[in-house]
C-alpha cells in the first residue's frame, strides 16, 4: 500500500528513467538544425572527431547527444528514415547496459544503430547478436549502408565461414552474427593450437536482439562442441525391441499409503519435465527381459557397475518411444531424424539431441543410427554473455521476465512507450470442452474474416497443429498459406504479405520473427522484384511501380477499415511472453487489430495445469456441447498456470547456472592458462615449475618430509626415477658417504639432476625449436584432460541429487567433488607433461619438428566435430561441422565467393556479405 502511494507521488523507476532520458532527447533535437546544414563529408568527419576526443579521455556518455544526432542525420540521408524520440530513448537504454522493451513494429533495428555507432567509436568492437543467420545478414546489409556512410566498417559472422573471413568480420568496428556462432567462436578460440588462428578480439559490448529468446528461452542448455564416441548401434536397436514389452503405469502411488495407482505398470512418464522413471516392477521386468535377450547375465542387476550404460540406453529408448512424437518433436526426412524447434517451428537440419536420445529415436524410426559424441568444450549462454564488458538487449516482450534479467544478468528492463498508442483489441479467451469444438469455432471465425476481406494470422504451437488447421481449411475451401518448419526458407516473404486483404496465414509460433506484417501487404518487396527485372524498360517499370503503390494504398485503406490484422491462436503457449509476441504481430505503430485465443480442455497446458479448475466451472454452469466459456476468471486461471510454468523454468535455468558457475570458474582457469601457453615466447619457467612439483611428489613417496634416514626407501626412489623419469642418480652411495644429509637435500639433488638431464636434451636441438614442441605437449595434455574432466563433471552432476537422500546438500557436494576432480586434472597434466618431457628421445631438430607437427595434427584432427546448441524447448541439438562431418547431408555449407549469399538476397556472396566480410 505504502509502495503504491509513493509510486503515485514520485513515479515508478521506469517513469523516472524515461524522464531523465527525455531531457537528453531535447538536447539531441536542439542539435538537429545544425547537423542538417553539414555536408556529407563534414557529417562523416564527425566520426574521426569523436574518435580523437575519446583518445584524449572524453567518455562515451559525454559524446552521446552529439553521436545520436549524427546517426539520426545520417539515417535521414541514407535510409530516408528519421529516428523517433522514443527510438532515441530506446538507444539510451541500450547504451547504458539495459534491456529496452519496444513493441513490434517500433523499429528496434533502427534504434540499435544509435548505441552501436556510439560504442563502435571506442575501436574495441561491437557485437550485434540476432536469433538467426537471415536476420544477421539482413540487418548487416540494411544498416551497413548507414555505418559505411559514417565511416565505420561492418562484418558479418556466418557459420562455416573460412577462418580469414571470420577474423576480418571480428576486426570490423561492428560485427553481426547469431548467439550460437559467437559462443562457438569463443569455444573454438580456446581450442586452437596457434595463437594466429583465434578469430575474436575481446568481448567489449554486445546488443542482443530478441534478448528474451536468447538469454531466457535458450539458456537452459549449454553450447557444446563434441567429437565422436564409440559406437553402440546394436544396443540402441536391442533396447528399442525391449520398450514394447514394458507397460506404462497409470496413476501415481502415494509415498505413505502406496495408493493412487489405477493400473500397475513398469514405468511412469512426467510430461512436464520430459522424463521417464522405472517402477519397482519395471526394474524386475526389465532385468528379466534383458537377461532373456542375452544383454545381461542371468540374475544380474540393472545397477551392477558393468550394466550402468544399459540403464542409460533403456531410459533413452523409453523417452524416444513415449515422449518424442513424429511431426511434433521431429520429422523423418531423407532417412534422417530432423528435429523441429517447438518454439519457432523451424526444422533444425543437421542438429542432434544428446545423451543418446537422438540415436534412440533413430532406432525407433528404423533409420541409420549415427554414433554418440564426447564433449570437447562447452559454455552456457548465461556465462558467455556475462564475459562482455557491457551487455544490453531489446525485445517486444521482456517485462514478464524482468526479474530474471535482473537476477541472473544484472540487466534492468526499461519499457519504452510506443510512438503511437496501440489500438489492438485483445479479446477474452474462449474455452471449449473438446479439441473438435475449438477447431470448429476457430474455422468459423477465420471464414467470417476471409469473407469480409480481413487478413488473418493463425498461430499454432507445433507443426502438427498447423497441419491440422491447414487440413480443416482445405476441407472448408478456404485458401491459405502455411508458414512452418517445412517452408522456412520463404518465411520472411510469406510473413511480409500476410497483411493483404483476405489473406489467411498459418504460422507455428514465432516463425518469421523480425519481419513486419504491413497492412495491405509489403509493397516494397514487390517493387524491389520489379526493379530487378531487366526485361522492362524504364518507362514500363515506373508505370508498374505507380500501379503497385496505388493498389497498395487501396488495400491498406480497406484492411484498416475492416479492423486490421486478426490474430487467431489455437493454443496457449506455456510462456505468456510467447503469446504476447504472437499478439504483437497485430496493431503495429498504432494500426488497428484484434486477437483471440481458442482453447480446449484437451490442450497440453490446460490438461497439465488448469484443466480441472476450468472443467469444474463448466460443469457447474452446465455448458452444452459447442458452447464456450468466455470469462475473465478463466483467462486469469490460465495465466496463473502459465506463471507456474514460467517460475518452474526460471528455477531450472537458475539451478543450471549455479551448477555451471562451478565449471565456469574452472573453465576460466584452463582457458587463461591455455592462452598464456599460446602467447608465451618461452615456456621454460612453466615446464621447470611443473617438473619440480611433480618430482617433489615422487620423492615424498619414498623420502617423507621431515623424516629420518631409517624411513627412507632410496633403492625404490632410484628405480622409479630411472624407469619413469629417465633420471639416473646413485642416492644410496651419496647418503652412505655423507655424515648428514636431509630429506630436503635429497629433493634438491633429484630436481637438480632432472633439470640438467632436461637441459642436455634441449641443448641437442636448441631452445627455440624445443619451445614449439613444449607448447604442443602442454596444449594437447590440457585439452585431453579437460575433455575427460567435462565428462566426469557431467556424470557427477547426473547422480549428485541422490546425495539428498543421505541428508547432504547436493550443490555443496557437487562443488566439493568438482574441486577435487579439478585438482586431480591439474596434477594429471603436470605428471603427463613432465613424464613426456623427461622420456622423449630427440636426436635432431628435424625429428622434433616432425613430432610437433604430428601432435598438432592429432589435436586438430578430431573426427566428426559437432556443435550442440539449445532451442527454446531446452533440448540439446547438434549440427555437424562441414570440415569434419562424416555425413555430408548433415554438414553446414561453406560459402564460396560466387555462391548465392546465405542471407537470401539472391546476390552472389562476393557482391553481398562477402563485401562486408
Curated annotation (Swiss-Prot):
UniProt key word Cytoplasm: yes
Cofactor entry: Zn(2+)
UniProt lineage: Bacteria, Pseudomonadati, Pseudomonadota, Betaproteobacteria, Burkholderiales
CDD domains the UniProt entry points to: DEXDc_SecA, SF2_C_secA
Compartments in which it is found: Cell inner membrane; Cytoplasm
Note describing how the cofactor binds: May bind 1 zinc ion per subunit.
Gene Ontology MF terms: ATP binding; metal ion binding; protein-exporting ATPase activity
Catalytic activity, as annotated: ATP + H2O + cellular proteinSide 1 = ADP + phosphate + cellular proteinSide 2
Protein residues bound to ATP: 87, 105-109, 516
One GO cellular component term: plasma membrane
BP GO terms, sorted: intracellular protein transmembrane transport; protein import; protein targeting; protein transport by the Sec complex
Sequence similarity: Belongs to the SecA family.
PROSITE patterns per record: SECA, SECA_MOTOR_DEAD
Keywords, in A-Z order: ATP-binding, Cell inner membrane, Cell membrane, Cytoplasm, Membrane, Metal-binding, Nucleotide-binding, Protein transport, Translocase, Translocation, Transport, Zinc
Subunit structure and binding partners: Monomer and homodimer. Part of the essential Sec protein translocation apparatus which comprises SecA, SecYEG and auxiliary proteins SecDF-YajC and YidC.
EC number(s) recorded for this UniProt protein: 7.4.2.8
Keyword match Metal-binding: yes
InterPro entries for the chain: Helicase_ATP-bd, Helicase_C-like, P-loop_NTPase, SEC_C_motif, SecA, SecA_CS, SecA_DEAD, SecA_motor_DEAD
Topology class, membrane: Peripheral membrane protein
Protein name: Protein translocase subunit SecA
Summary of the function given for this chain in its UniProt record: Part of the Sec protein translocase complex. Interacts with the SecYEG preprotein conducting channel. Has a central role in coupling the hydrolysis of ATP to the transfer of proteins into and across the cell membrane, serving both as a receptor for the preprotein-SecB complex and as an ATP-driven molecular motor driving the stepwise translocation of polypeptide chains across the membrane.
Gene coding for it: secA
Any Pfam family matching the protein: SecA_PP_bind
Amino acid at each position: 500500500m505504502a509502495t503504491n502511494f509513493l509510486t503515485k507521488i514520485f513515479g515508478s523507476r521506469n517513469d523516472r528513467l524515461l524522464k531523465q532520458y527525455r531531457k537528453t532527447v531535447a538536447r539531441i533535437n536542439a542539435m538537429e538544425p545544425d547537423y542538417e546544414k553539414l555536408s556529407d563529408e563534414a557529417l562523416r568527419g564527425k566520426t574521426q572527431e569523436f574518435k580523437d576526443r575519446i583518445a584524449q579521455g572524453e567518455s562515451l556518455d559525454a559524446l552521446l547527444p552529439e553521436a545520436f544526432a549524427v546517426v539520426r542525420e545520417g539515417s535521414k540521408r541514407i535510409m530516408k528514415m528519421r529516428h523517433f524520440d522514443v527510438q532515441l530513448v530506446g538507444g539510451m537504454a541500450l547504451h547504458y547496459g539495459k534491456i529496452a522493451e519496444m513493441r513490434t513494429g517500433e523499429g528496434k533495428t533502427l534504434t540499435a544503430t544509435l548505441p552501436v555507432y556510439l560504442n563502435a567509436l571506442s575501436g574495441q568492437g561491437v557485437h550485434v547478436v540476432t536469433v538467426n543467420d537471415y536476420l544477421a545478414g539482413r540487418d548487416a546489409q540494411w544498416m551497413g549502408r548507414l555505418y559505411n556512410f559514417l565511416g565505420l566498417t561492418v562484418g558479418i559472422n556466418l557459420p562455416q565461414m573460412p577462418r580469414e573471413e571470420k577474423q576480418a568480420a571480428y576486426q570490423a568496428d561492428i560485427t553481426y552474427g547469431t548467439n550460437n556462432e559467437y559462443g562457438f567462436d569463443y569455444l573454438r578460440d580456446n581450442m586452437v593450437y596457434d595463437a594466429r588462428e583465434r578469430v575474436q578480439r575481446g568481448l567489449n559490448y554486445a546488443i542482443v536482439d530478441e534478448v528474451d529468446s536468447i538469454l531466457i528461452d535458450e539458456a537452459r542448455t549449454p553450447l557444446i562442441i563434441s567429437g565422436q564416441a564409440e559406437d553402440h548401434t546394436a544396443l540402441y536397436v536391442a533396447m528399442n525391441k525391449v520398450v514394447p514389452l514394458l507397460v506404462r503405469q497409470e496413476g501415481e502411488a502415494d509415498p505413505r499409503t502406496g495408493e493412487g495407482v489405477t493400473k500397475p505398470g513398469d514405468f511412469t512418464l512426467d510430461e512436464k519435465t520430459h522424463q521417464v522413471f522405472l517402477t519397482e516392477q519395471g526394474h524386475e521386468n526389465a532385468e528379466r527381459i534383458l537377461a532373456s535377450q542375452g544383454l545381461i547375465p542371468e540374475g544380474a542387476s540393472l545397477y551392477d557397475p558393468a550394466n550402468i550404460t544399459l540403464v542409460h540406453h533403456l531410459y533413452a529408448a523409453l523417452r524416444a518411444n513415449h515422449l518424442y512424437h513424429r511431426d511434433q518433436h521431429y520429422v523423418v526426412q531423407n532417412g534422417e531424424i530432423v528435429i523441429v524447434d517447438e518454439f519457432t517451428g523451424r526444422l533444425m537440419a543437421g542438429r542432434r539431441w544428446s545423451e543418446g536420445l537422438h540415436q534412440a529415436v533413430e532406432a525407433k524410426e528404423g533409420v541409420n543410427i549415427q554414433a554418440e559424441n564426447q564433449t570437447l568444450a562447452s559454455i552456457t549462454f548465461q556465462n558467455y554473455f556475462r564475459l562482455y564488458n557491457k551487455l544490453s538487449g531489446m525485445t517486444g516482450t521482456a517485462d514478464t521476465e524482468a526479474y530474471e534479467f535482473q537476477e541472473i544478468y544484472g540487466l534492468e528492463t526499461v519499457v519504452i512507450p510506443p510512438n503511437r498508442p496501440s489500438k489492438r483489441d485483445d479479446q477474452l479467451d474462449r474455452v471449449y470442452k473438446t479439441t473438435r469444438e475449438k477447431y470448429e469455432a476457430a474455422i468459423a471465425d477465420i471464414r467470417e474474416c476471409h469473407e469480409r476481406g480481413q487478413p488473418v494470422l493463425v498461430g499454432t504451437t507445433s507443426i502438427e497443429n498447423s497441419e491440422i488447421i491447414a487440413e480443416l481449411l482445405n476441407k472448408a475451401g478456404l485458401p491459405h498459406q502455411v508458414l512452418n518448419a517445412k517452408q522456412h526458407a520463404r518465411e520472411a516473404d510469406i510473413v511480409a504479405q500476410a497483411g493483404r486483404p483476405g489473406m489467411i496465414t498459418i504460422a507455428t509460433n514465432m516463425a518469421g520473427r523480425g519481419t513486419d506484417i504491413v497492412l495491405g501487404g509489403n509493397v516494397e518487396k514487390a517493387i524491389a522484384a520489379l526493379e530487378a527485372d531487366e526485361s522492362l524498360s524504364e518507362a514500363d517499370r515506373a508505370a508498374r511501380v505507380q500501379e503497385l503503390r496505388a493498389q497498395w494504398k487501396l488495400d491498406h485503406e480497406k484492411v484498416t477499415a475492416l479492423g486490421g490484422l486478426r490474430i487467431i491462436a489455437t493454443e496457449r503457449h506455456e510462456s505468456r511472453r510467447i503469446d504476447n509476441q504472437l499478439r504483437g504481430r497485430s496493431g503495429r505503430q498504432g494500426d488497428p487489430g484484434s486477437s483471440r485465443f481458442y482453447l480446449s480442455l484437451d490442450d497440453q497446458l490446460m490438461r497439465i495445469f488448469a484443466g480441472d479448475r476450468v472443467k469444474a466451472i463448466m460443469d457447474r454452469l452446465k455448458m452444452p456441447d459447442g458452447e464456450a466459456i468466455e470469462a475473465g476468471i478463466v483467462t486469469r486461471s490460465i495465466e496463473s498456470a502459465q506463471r507456474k510454468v514460467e517460475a518452474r523454468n526460471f528455477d531450472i535455468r537458475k539451478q543450471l547456472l549455479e551448477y555451471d558457475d562451478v565449471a565456469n570458474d574452472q573453465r576460466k582457469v584452463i582457458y587463461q592458462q591455455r592462452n598464456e601457453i599460446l602467447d608465451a615466447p618461452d615456456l621454460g619457467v612453466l615446464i621447470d615449475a611443473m617438473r619440480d612439483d611433480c618430482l617433489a611428489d615422487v620423492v615424498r613417496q619414498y623420502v617423507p618430509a621431515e623424516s629420518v634416514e631409517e624411513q627412507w626407501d632410496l633403492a625404490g626412489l632410484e628405480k622409479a626415477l630411472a624407469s619413469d623419469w629417465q633420471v639416473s642418480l646413485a642416492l644410496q652411495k651419496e647418503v652412505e658417504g655423507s655424515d648428514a644429509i636431509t630429506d630436503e637435500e635429497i629433493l634438491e639433488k633429484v630436481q637438480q639432476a632432472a633439470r640438467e638431464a632436461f637441459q642436455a636434451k634441449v641443448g641437442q636441438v636448441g631452445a627455440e625449436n624445443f619451445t614449439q614442441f613444449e607448447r604442443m605437449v602442454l596444449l594437447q595434455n590440457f585439452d585431453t584432460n579437460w575433455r575427460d574432466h567435462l565428462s566426469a563433471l557431467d556424470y557427477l552432476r547426473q547422480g549428485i541429487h541422490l546425495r539428498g537422500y543421505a541428508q547432504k546438500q547436493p550443490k555443496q557436494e557437487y562443488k566439493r567433488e568438482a574441486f577435487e576432480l579439478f585438482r586431480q586434472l591439474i596434477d594429471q597434466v603436470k605428471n603427463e607433461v613432465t613424464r613426456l618431457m623427461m622420456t622423449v628421445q630427440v636426436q635432431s631438430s628435424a625429428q622434433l619438428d616432425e613430432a610437433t607437427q604430428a601432435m598438432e595434427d592429432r589435436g586438430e584432427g578430431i573426427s566428426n566435430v559437432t556443435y550442440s546448441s539449445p532451442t527454446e524447448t531446452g533440448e540439446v541439438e547438434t549440427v555437424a561441422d562441414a570440415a569434419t562431418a562424416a555425413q555430408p547431408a548433415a554438414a553446414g555449407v561453406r560459402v564460396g565467393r560466387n555462391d548465392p549469399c546465405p542471407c537470401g538476397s539472391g546476390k552472389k556472396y562476393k557482391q553481398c556479405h562477402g563485401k562486408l566480410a
